[in-house]
Amino acid sequence: MKYNLLNNMKINNKKLKLKLILMMITMKRLNNMNQHNIYKNRYYNKNNNLQYLNKLNTYNNKMYYFNKQLMNNMLIIDNTFNNLLKKMMMSNNILMTNLKFEHRTNSIHIKYYFYNYMNINNDELSKLYNNYMMSINNQMINLLNNDNNSLNNLMTKYYNKKVYINTYKLNYMYLDTELLSQTLTNIYNNNGLSLKSLKMIINKLPFNNDMLLSKNYVNKMNKYNLTINNNLNNNKKDLINLYTLDNKLLDLSITNNMLLGKYLVGSNIQLKGRTLNRNITRTMKMNIMKGTFNNYMYQWSKLNNLYKLNYMSTNINKTNNTFINKNGMFNIKIKLNTI
């Protein structure tokens, strides 16, 4: 009997040890999975940390007034100024985004992006057109900021604050969804937008691989840190002549690579509605996706909740425009993923 009891005790101890070993293995596996998910989220979602620094960077208008009537009046002035400036730009064949307002205590800062969508192949005509556009841009800058009768001075009378207008020229229309949607609507209004023409436009967009970009960025940063750390113990003259001696270090362009929204990674264009083509009587539906949205992570949960603040990450640019024609309505949804 004693021998049987001892055997049973040994067997039970072995079972307990096996259970403890299995529990330790599962705990280690779960910890590794959690760490892997953390690193994966950091890697794919590296731009989202900026959202927590500025909780209002997704809105086009930043203002707060204690008086609601004053706030409504400011919104009306903002909308009218936005529409007037857009009409002025369209008359000069220039596409522009909606104005982004920032109301401060003593000043108002306004910024927008614009793009010249006239493309001329002939060299002589292109030179004439470039000179013409340079003169228009200079006139616009003088109209916005420099002259005594500039828009800044005119808008200060309405706002009773100092107004600063900052313009940014984009060389490519795919860098902003509003500009891309406006170019598509121009093609739609002039020639009619078909599936073939839309695919041609999307195929011309330069898509990049986010994995290669991130690896190149990490390698450049490591090389930069190594060169700096190796030369920390040298003299000041060597540190000053560091960039002139190392030509490869000049080609790193780290600050240029740190810019957000520089490289296009993926696009999703959805069209729905009635076109101007008489042969097509029914509504048209097209959804074309190219590239990747791997780094597309929501801020708060896996589900897309429109009612939460900053539910979209900073690397996603999204627009939704609806246009009315003689046959009905036409809707364009564009989503661009940048890194």
From Swiss-Prot:
Any one Gene Ontology molecular-function term assigned to this protein's record: structural constituent of ribosome
Keywords noted in UniProt: Mitochondrion, Ribonucleoprotein, Ribosomal protein
Subcellular location: Mitochondrion
Pfam families: VAR1
Primary residence: mitochondrion
Record-level GO cellular component terms: mitochondrial small ribosomal subunit
Keyword Ribonucleoprotein: yes
The keyword Translocase is annotated on this UniProt entry: no
One of the GO biological process terms: mitochondrial translation
Coiled-coil portions: none
Function as written in the Swiss-Prot or TrEMBL entry: Essential for mitochondrial protein synthesis and required for the maturation of small ribosomal subunits.
Protein name per Swiss-Prot or TrEMBL: Small ribosomal subunit protein uS3m
Gene name of the encoded protein: VAR1
